[in-house]
């Protein structure tokens, strides 16, 4: 009978140890997510510091994305694709869609009037630059799905459903859903 007592004791210790480790991993995961969101907020603040209009645009679009994804969740067409987690990631990633504007020179970004053709070509590079920044800075920090969503939103948010957008001239469902949502907002 002593053998059973030792076995039960070992199993109980193992269970509590495993539970303790799982709790620690969960706490660290939440801490990492908190840090990542702080980094994202810092990126958004950097954009806002360079261009006050873009900063206000970032806050508004993030709120609009949240409203739109919530409405889409109630639509039979998108209910299975837009989970609560997806909606939350798209809303958070919306803050980064214009991060590539950090690489746009001030004379273009802050120009009060219409851009020349040359300046417009410079401005059109911000989606690709934003996607690159997201991949390089968040690729090792954030979960793969979030990085994929943020990358797509930054890279494709100027594509048009009917075609004629940039940088890839995609159309319709060739454009990732997250980028289509961003383009509306």
Describe each region flagged by the PLM:
Residues 34-185:
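Histidine- and acidic-residue-rich, metal-dependent catalytic cores
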